[in-house]
């Protein structure tokens, strides 16, 4: 296994340095992200905004090590991770990152409680009894103490997304990344989801980065960043 390069970033949980990303489209090379630089502090709640096609989701995928970069460096919790192989990247994702997407991706045959437990069971970090106890506590945090035994088809859209948030927290990630988490929800439910993120951020000192097109909802975050033509403003 490669040795990680360390960077003394003190209060920085993630740093992107001179990130370039290209895509090929009908024979044309598109420069999606251009020498992009970003730092996220520990315990910070950050929103990334931009027009459709601005590269917001690409940026979040790069932060989550779901997509590779074409130039630059990525640092997570003072370790350089941009040059790691696939197995090492997966290890970082499992230990340091939590993900929430626009669609909840809950498994229909399992209850809310079981869905939250799955990532921890797969990683085999703890025994099943401990995992179940922590999953119940997380469902209480997101306001679903009475819905633990319900399956996804018995939950509302907002409740499903709250289960997804609890699932993202089960492995105690250093950073939660959320890609348009309110995109499929009505305005009132979207506000509840952002309020929940803020509560988790404040009460648990959880670092969160959320990509959204909803500028009004992003007002509750510590910092708003705008992505335009591959550059942060």
Swiss-Prot record:
Its main location: membrane. It is found in: Cell inner membrane. SUPFAM superfamilies: P-loop containing nucleoside triphosphate hydrolases. PROSITE patterns: ABC_TRANSPORTER_1 (PS00211), ABC_TRANSPORTER_2 (PS50893), LOLD (PS51244). InterPro entries: AAA+_ATPase, ABC_transporter-like_ATP-bd, ABC_transporter-like_CS, MacB-like_ATP-bd, P-loop_NTPase. This is Lipoprotein-releasing system ATP-binding protein LolD. It comes from the Bacteria. Residues 14-233 form the ABC transporter domain. The keyword rRNA-binding does not apply. GO terms for cellular component: plasma membrane. Coiled coil: none annotated. It comes from Fusobacterium nucleatum subsp. nucleatum (strain ATCC 25586 / DSM 15643 / BCRC 10681 / CIP 101130 / JCM 8532 / KCTC 2640 / LMG 13131 / VPI 4355). It is an enzyme of class 7 (translocase). ATP binds at residues 50-57. One of its GO terms (molecular function) is ATP hydrolysis activity. Part of the ABC transporter complex LolCDE involved in the translocation of mature outer membrane-directed lipoproteins, from the inner membrane to the periplasmic chaperone, LolA. Responsible for the formation of the LolA-lipoprotein complex in an ATP-dependent manner. Belongs to the ABC transporter superfamily. Lipoprotein translocase (TC 3.A.1.125) family. Its EC number is 7.6.2.-. The complex is composed of two ATP-binding proteins (LolD) and two transmembrane proteins (LolC and LolE).
